[in-house]
Amino acid sequence: MNNIWWQTKGQGNVHLVLLHGWGLNAEVWRCIDEELSSHFTLHLVDLPGFGRSRGFGALSLADMAEAVLQQAPDKAIWLGWSLGGLVASQIVLTHPERVQALVTVASSPCFSARDEWPGIKPDVLAGFQQQLSDDFQRTVERFLALQTMGTETARQDARALKKTVLALPMPEVDVLNGGLEILKTVDLRQPLQNVSMPFLRLYGYLDGLVPRKVVPMLDKLWPHSESYIFAKAAHAPFISHPVEFCHLLVALKQRV
């Protein structure tokens, strides 16, 4: 049986769907869910194959987006962190009528480094895939440590992420590999040029996975979108800067 785990909180007049990143689950939002559910009708989701959404194998980005949409409200602000940013972006491209605004957090339309495009070196992603087969819990923990490196609260932020992972059964190796394959191969830079709805991109200045060099490049490529960089955050700004993070989302709500 493959069901998407979905939790709804709050009674705001605007719906906000939160999509987590690779290897994690919706528990990662517990640091901000109380605050956000006082402003929005908040939807917490475990992506297919992650957390409590069991029974899924590796999915393509398009199939992952379709699976998530099955239980989604008719219209919402879609927020995706990291890999979740690609899923939210895919939903905008295929079902724009279901989206009030798009928010990507520490996400890139193309995570993999390409010619004249900063990103994660393909051999690093391939290395993660190889190591998953050998010792996947350690590999996931390594990936989490990368996400908080360099911040003033790096240790406690990494602990918060690790606690999220360990709170629920680990995803299957093929699901984790499928997620890495999406990060390695997907490129939405051109398709997202045509997005006309409110589009907010949030970044961490210290992010080791999504280099800040992509921000001005995407400002130019997507002039209709807005970007904001958390000066002292890495890959998880909602954990290191929860108050500032929520403030930006509440401000966006006033504009949709």
UniProtKB/Swiss-Prot annotation:
GO cellular component, one term: cytoplasm
Domain AB hydrolase-1: 15-242
Gene3D superfamilies (alphabetical): alpha/beta hydrolase (3.40.50.1820)
Annotated localization: Cytoplasm
Known catalytic reactions: 6-carboxyhexanoyl-[ACP] methyl ester + H2O = 6-carboxyhexanoyl-[ACP] + methanol + H(+)
PANTHER family on file: HYDROLASE ALPHA/BETA FOLD FAMILY, PIMELOYL-[ACYL-CARRIER PROTEIN] METHYL ESTER ESTERASE
Family statement: Belongs to the AB hydrolase superfamily. Carboxylesterase BioH family.
Protein name, per record: Pimeloyl-[acyl-carrier protein] methyl ester esterase
Source species of the chain: Escherichia coli (strain 55989 / EAEC)
Name of the coding gene: bioH
